[in-house]
Amino acid sequence: GVKKEGATIGIRLSHAGAQTSESACGEQPVGPSVLNFGRDFDISREFDQGDVEEIVLNFVHAAERAEEVGMDFVEINGTEQQLLDQCCCIKLNNRDDEYGTAKIENRVQLALDVVNSIKKRESVKIPLSYYFSIFDKIDDGFKPKDLKKMLTLLENAGVDIFHPLAIHAMNKCFENKEPLCHWSAKYTDKPMIINGNIKSPQLLEEAATLGCADWFAMDQSIFDRLQWYQFLKRKIDK
């Protein structure tokens, strides 16, 4: 399978938060606030402390299962407007408690709870990655200092790997100065996964010149070509 081809494989763990419906999950969706993502989704209720405990425990159990089936690492989804991303977004989170307000340390608190609990579980020994993006938050005032604070908090909680999301790996942010992966590498020494429309040796080499990637993630790119990784490796080794 994947490992025989020389690749590393991990599994991403997500909680949809308000971006689901009662028919899909069996109960009213929960989110950081009362939200409605559209006609295909139900209006969420604001999560309470009991919900937090259940959410965290579900992430821990999912990480345990990832370890059991032989994953090389497990990744927490903090982007794609899933629950942890909803908490981080000012437009979607209007709480005034420890999981809200304008402070980034409050908006990332649920993610910290998840990471802390997974790292404390002795049955989970594989590395923990955190998947995040900030492009949709910049217009709402998300600054480099917020990125630095967020990464520092997550690193202190136990994140082993960071995985910044960009539509294209080379897309620049914060006044169009540098790609997100480059900004992230300024604020953490943890290994970095880069992805974002990397579908050719040329694009991979361009991304590699940034000098901040330890791994390059391939997802949809490999579906059409099962030998895609070996093809790419041969091209680069030439």
What are these regions (language model features)?
Residues 1-238:
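Flavin-dependent oxidoreductase catalytic cores
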